[in-house]
Amino acid sequence: MLTLIQGKKIVNYLRSRLAFEYNGQLIKILSKNIVAVGSLRREEKMLNDVDLLIIVPEKKCLKHVLPNIRIKGLSFSVKVCGERKCVLFIEWEKKTYQLDLFTALAEEKPYAIFHFTGPVSYLIRIRAALKKKNYKLNQYGLFKNQTLVPLKITTEKELIKELGFTYRIPKKRL
């Protein structure tokens, strides 16, 4: 367990130190492409882990980012890692914490932020209401009859309003 303040410190540290190796070169992940999600974004007082979403510009980049993740100046071990999710254990101030990294394409960003911010109970209610209208919402997009429904949105707030719900800041979601 770590406090919200510790979680924010870890995220601030990571924003300037996340990179991935590609063709023998270290590629820095820009701070603007790193989004805190999960209990940290909901500003819960105590956190089980730190969740970060990394926005990737192109689909072909997915296979390179997480499997080749590097953190400058921080000791870590990989528990499990794939193209879309990586679970790490990081050493921070003489303690070990879990860091969950997720990836999303730029066009998936609002959906992924909503999905990974949660909480699960809130997502279930939204998805149940959408299911009654034959829609499916996940971290990749909004679908009707298994076909992606293109929405002209760029933020999570726009997504919620487009779906016909009242936007609640993450801290107020139950």
UniProtKB/Swiss-Prot annotation:
Main location: virion
Subcellular location: Virion
EC number: 2.7.7.7
Annotated stretches, region: Involved in ssDNA binding: 42-51
Organism of provenance: African swine fever virus (isolate Tick/Malawi/Lil 20-1/1983)
Residues the record marks as site: Stabilizes dGTP in a syn conformation to overcome the Watson-Crick base pairing constraint: 115
Keyword terms of this UniProt record: Disulfide bond, DNA damage, DNA repair, DNA-binding, DNA-directed DNA polymerase, Magnesium, Metal-binding, Nucleotidyltransferase, Transferase, Virion
Similarity comment: Belongs to the DNA polymerase type-X family.
Lineage, top ranks: Viruses, Varidnaviria, Bamfordvirae, Nucleocytoviricota, Pokkesviricetes
Superkingdom of origin: Viruses
Disulfide bonds: 81-86
Co-factor binding comment: In the presence of magnesium, pol X shows a strong preference for the ssDNA gaps having one and two nucleotides.
Gene3D superfamilies cross-referenced by the UniProt entry: Beta Polymerase, domain 2, DNA polymerase, thumb domain
Anything else known: Consistent with its intracellular location, ASFV encodes its own replicative DNA polymerase and three base excision repair enzymes: a class II AP endonuclease, the repair polymerase Pol X, and an ATP-dependent DNA ligase.
Record comment regarding domains: Small DNA polymerase formed from only a palm and a C-terminal subdomain. The total DNA-binding site of pol X is composed of two DNA-binding subsites.
GO cellular component, as recorded: virion component
Name of the protein in question: Repair DNA polymerase X
Molecular functions (GO terms): DNA binding; DNA-directed DNA polymerase activity; metal ion binding
Catalytic activity entry: DNA(n) + a 2'-deoxyribonucleoside 5'-triphosphate = DNA(n+1) + diphosphate
